[in-house]
């Protein structure tokens, strides 16, 4: 499966649009990470625990989006975008979305 943030794939031609595909995950914070985040916010610096959590969540969202594209018989996903939002206090959602397409063979 090819997936890209661009609207085209160099060297490939889109034969058919299979529709919008999405993948999302809601990730909650861990109390230990919250304590470290509080300390980091005082002294400054990257909060590695949250960075790792969001990277993992993004990977899961992409995986779910790719699974949906496979179910639609797509060869690729173009125009991928990501959004994040706070769902409830202590949790965040990452949504990945794009257009599933069939490529000319």
UniProtKB/Swiss-Prot annotation:
Any Pfam family matching the protein: YbjQ_1
Cited SUPFAM superfamilies: YbjQ-like (SSF117782)
UniProt xrefs under InterPro entries: UPF0145_dom_sf (IPR035439), UPF0145_YbjQ-like (IPR002765)
Entry's family note: Belongs to the UPF0145 family.
Protein name, per record: UPF0145 protein VP1283
Species of origin: Vibrio parahaemolyticus serotype O3:K6 (strain RIMD 2210633)
């Amino acid at each position: 499966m090819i997936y890209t943030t661009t609207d085209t794939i160099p060297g490939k031609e889109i034969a058919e649009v299979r529709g919008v595909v999405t993948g999302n995950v809601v990730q909650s914070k861990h109390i230990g990470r919250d304590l470290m985040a509080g300390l980091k916010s005082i002294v400054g610096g990257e909060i590695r625990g949250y960075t790792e959590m969001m990277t993992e969540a993004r990977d899961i969202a992409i995986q779910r989006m790719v699974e949906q594209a496979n179910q639609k018989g797509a060869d690729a996903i173009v125009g991928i975008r990501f959004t994040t939002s706070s769902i409830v206090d202590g949790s965040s959602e990452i949504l990945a979305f794009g257009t599933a397409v069939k490529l000319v063979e």
